């Protein structure tokens, strides 16, 4: 798909990494770009859900390499990577491990093997020299959409949790603690839905903003992303995590393996 898009440079492409459209994320990206928290030093990210935590959940094609591809990395981890790269820049190297927590699932023919990962952990070195940690799971009981991340900078810290998606927590050097920033109409994408603060911006609104950005890009009035090329970068990262087996992988090697 990325090669096809490159062969047709006039075509607009967009992938549905909609968490990049939340007002809190947009505010965080601006704070990072403006160096409000100084030089980013470290990223800590988690994306956990529990939709596969029940061991009696029936086997499905999504649990196979041929039909479903990757497991938690493909369902959840790619979204965390999209946020991570947008905030921290390119990944240079990573070391990861994966786990299949429930090796078999019931089916009408009897127990069938689960082939793709239920969870994954990774340590990351960014091209900037910053470091990161990454975790994702589809068997984390009690977690519904815990896309949680924080950035430690030389002069502050940002903290976000998708389960409280209208809040961004900010610490600046010298502060005694964190300040809660509640998203509101000062973010244009929020104001397009509601002129009053505190009323909340939801998951579906993120998708509407995403569609608007695609339409604007087709009209030629504004660029949008991530496009297919950026999506290929995300795929290379999660496939590097899937094949690392505890060994360091450079993104050049991940490119060759993809």
Each language-model region and where it sits:
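Alpha-helical structural signal in soluble globular domains
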Residues: 1-7, 31-34, 125
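C-terminal glycine/acidic-rich active-site capping loop/insertion
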Residues: 103, 107, 113, 121, ...
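Predominantly a Rossmann-like dinucleotide-binding segment in NAD(P)-dependent oxidoreductases
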Residues: 9-14, 19-114, 168, 248
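Glycine-rich phosphate/pyrophosphate-binding beta-alpha loops
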Residues: 78, 135-143
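Glycine/proline-rich active-site loop of Rossmann-fold NAD(P)-dependent oxidoreductases
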Residues: 115-116, 130, 143-147
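Conserved G/P- and acidic residue-centered "switch" motifs that form tight phosphate/ATP-binding loops
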Residues: 35, 129, 221
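C-terminal helix-rich "cap/oligomerization" subdomain common to oxidoreductases
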Residues: 2, 6-7, 12, 199, ...
